[in-house]
Swiss-Prot record:
This is Phosphoglucosamine mutase. It catalyses: alpha-D-glucosamine 1-phosphate = D-glucosamine 6-phosphate. Its cofactor is Mg(2+). The keyword rRNA-binding does not apply. Signal peptide: none annotated. One of its GO terms (cellular component) is cytosol. The active site is at residue 101. Mg(2+) binds at residues 101, 240, 242, 244.
Length: 446
């Protein structure tokens, strides 16, 4: 059955539209509560990022859950992976995160975790949707849910993250620039690295409700790259608005993406022979260089559709524990149930300290193929497969690559854009081909 409200990662959109408003969020909270009503004294954890609209959505969800007889624990601004961890840790029945991840402040959304800290199954999402379409009824007064602040949430998550770093190792001697994207990680990430001994320069750590992901964070690392060079830092770390993805910067000020970080982690495990990976999951967007490097080390590699949910699904099907995306979502089931930017950063820093090598040297393990990604804004729905102009452009692009590359056009699951990706052996031809395809898509939207 096709879902009516849920997308690839919860429910997301422009604040004030038909879904991201107080009325719908009230009903959504009630619907979630109804699905959990079979649980005795059900409790739901709610966290959020730093968007101004988070207050409205939090209040509406809280009212709906209470009306269904469910208790609520409120953490305030916390990274998405923190809610996944804490939901399981405090034995809550579900966790809710109010966030639109890497999008700017006019957008917001809601995503969910089950009691084990994993994202909801399709069956549960459909059950919630079924309740949304029913008339809302409030339980009697003595069964209303109660709400309480979880003041210890920050401290518990900080200690959990530190527990994933070897106790006989510190970050002393490292200077780290941390870009918090003016998002959910601002109150916890700098403290974690500082408590482990690093000298920390925090940037984009002053959210005002409107500046989340604004010229900062994992999707815009230009300022971080400048600051790493300016401060003569060893490494730069960039999170996105909800802290579940990570991009790093080496001491030369050069960006290190999710494919490279995933490769470093996989090869490290391979040589340590501790939990050596049987295989690694990437996506259809992952650089071919990642696949080639892993196969040289006899590590299997499989591609899933884009989205950390699909990465995790394939990991679980294969029985593998490591996977991720070029964008910086990296899932390590040895530590977490979802992508966690802080924990991924700690693993890379551990490798740097143990190997006594800078990130610039570690990333040399993988040679990236030239790859160009262009996001083309669209209005409405564009059928890529049936559009004659786009089909003609793809045929021409395949001729230009001459069998030595990959072409991928796909609609984003989170933004109104078509993503055009071209990969090949010659950077000039790759860029020219990508720009030609992007122009064809743009022309088709007029």
């Amino acid at each position: 059955m096709q879902k009516k409200y849920f997308g690839t990662d919860g429910i997301r959109g422009k604040v004030g539209n038909s879904l991201i408003n107080a009325e719908f969020m009230l009903k959504l909270g009630w619907a979630v509560g109804r699905v959990l009503a079979n649980s005795h004294s059900a409790t739901v954890l709610i966290g959020k990022d730093t968007r101004i609209s988070g207050y409205m959505i939090e209040s509406a969800l809280q009212a709906g859950l209470s009306a269904a007889g469910v208790n609520i624990k409120l953490t305030g601004p916390m990274p998405t992976p923190a809610i996944a961890y804490l939901t399981n840790s405090v034995r809550a029945d579900a966790g809710i995160v109010i966030s639109a991840s890497h999008n700017h402040y006019p957008d917001n959304g809601v995503k969910f975790f089950n009691k084990d800290g994993f994202k909801l199954s399709d069956e549960l999402e459909l059950a919630i949707e079924k309740q949304i379409d029913k008339p809302m009824k409030t339980v009697v007064a003595d069964r209303l849910g109660k709400a309480a602040r979880m003041n210890e949430a920050h401290g518990r998550y900080i200690e959990f993250c530190k527990s994933t770093f070897p106790s006989n190792l510190t970050l002393k001697g490292l200077k780290i620039v941390v870009d918090c994207a003016n998002g959910a990680a601002y109150a916890v990430a700098p403290s974690i690295f500082h408590e482990l001994g690093a000298e920390v320069v925090a940037i984009a750590d002053d959210p005002d409700g409107f500046n989340i992901n604004q010229t900062c964070g994992a999707t815009d690392t230009a300022h971080l790259q400048e600051m790493v060079v300016k401060h003569n830092a060893d490494v730069g770390i960039a999170f996105d608005g909800d802290g579940d993805r990570l991009i790093m910067v080496d001491h030369h000020g050069l960006r290190v993406d999710g494919d490279e970080l995933l490769c470093i982690m996989a090869i490290d495990r391979f040589y340590l022979k501790e939990n050596a990976p049987l295989g690694v999951v990437g996506t259809i967007m992952s650089n071919l260089g990642l696949e080639q490097t892993l196969k040289r080390h006899h590590i299997a590699f499989e591609r899933s559709p884009v989205g950390d949910r699909y990465v995790l699904d394939l990991m679980q099907q294969k029985g593998w524990f490591l996977g991720g995306e070029s964008s910086g979502h990296i899932v390590d089931l040895g530590f977490t149930t979802t992508g966690d930017g802080v924990i991924t950063a700690l693993q890379i820093l551990r490798i740097m300290q143990q190997a006594e090598k800078p990130l610039a040297d570690l990333k040399k393990v993988m040679v990236k193929n030239p790859q160009v990604l262009i996001n083309v804004p669209i209005k409405g729905i564009l059928d890529i497969a049936q559009n004659p102009n786009i089909k003609k452009a793809i045929t021409e692009a395949e001729k230009q690559l001459n069998g030595a590359g990959r072409i991928l056009l796909r609609p984003s699951g989170t933004e109104p854009v078509i993503r055009v990706m071209v990969e090949g052996s010659d950077e000039g031809i790759v860029r020219q081909t990508a720009e030609m395809l992007a122009a064809a898509v743009q022309q088709s939207t007029l």
